Amino acid sequence: MKTYLILATLALIFSAMLTNICAVAFEQPKYCTEAPGDGKCPGEVRPAISTANWTFSKSFGGCVAHRWGSCGNHSNVFPKCLSCMTTCDPENATTYCDGWN
């Protein structure tokens, strides 16, 4: 009986340890919630050259297509939906971006 109690206790402890190891929370980078801007170069009314990129939108709940000029450096601008979602919401990345890359 003592052996059974000891084994049951060890099993519970081991189970709790595995739960803590597997439950590491994802911490979204702060730049995922920053406004992306438009990438205009100084003196431009609008970007002369712009490309379709992706930016994470907290209010939308995922990444959205975004026109980005060639100037400025911004971390919340990604070349593909999958790279945007993998960085900012990895749990939903593959299903959210299905067909967009």
Swiss-Prot record:
**Alphabetical keyword list:** Blood coagulation cascade inhibiting toxin, Disulfide bond, Glycoprotein, Hemostasis impairing toxin, Secreted, Signal, Toxin
Q: BPTI/Kunitz inhibitor domain location, by residue?
A: 32-88
Q: Where's it mainly located?
A: secreted
Localisation: Secreted
> What high-level taxonomic lineage is stated for the organism?
Eukaryota, Metazoa, Ecdysozoa, Arthropoda, Chelicerata
List the Gene Ontology MF annotations in alphabetical order.
Answer: serine-type endopeptidase inhibitor activity; toxin activity
Q: Which cysteines are joined by disulfide bonds?
A: C32-C88, C41-C71, C63-C84
Keyword Signal: yes or no? yes
The keyword Protein biosynthesis belongs to this UniProt entry's keyword annotation: no
User: What is this protein called in UniProt?
Assistant: Kunitz-type anticoagulant protein HA11
Which Gene Ontology CC terms are recorded?
extracellular region
Entries under Pfam families matching the protein: Kunitz_BPTI (PF00014)
The UniProt entry, under InterPro entries, shows:
Kunitz_BPTI (IPR002223), Kunitz_BPTI_sf (IPR036880)
Q: Name one process (GO BP) from the record.
A: envenomation resulting in negative regulation of voltage-gated potassium channel activity in another organism
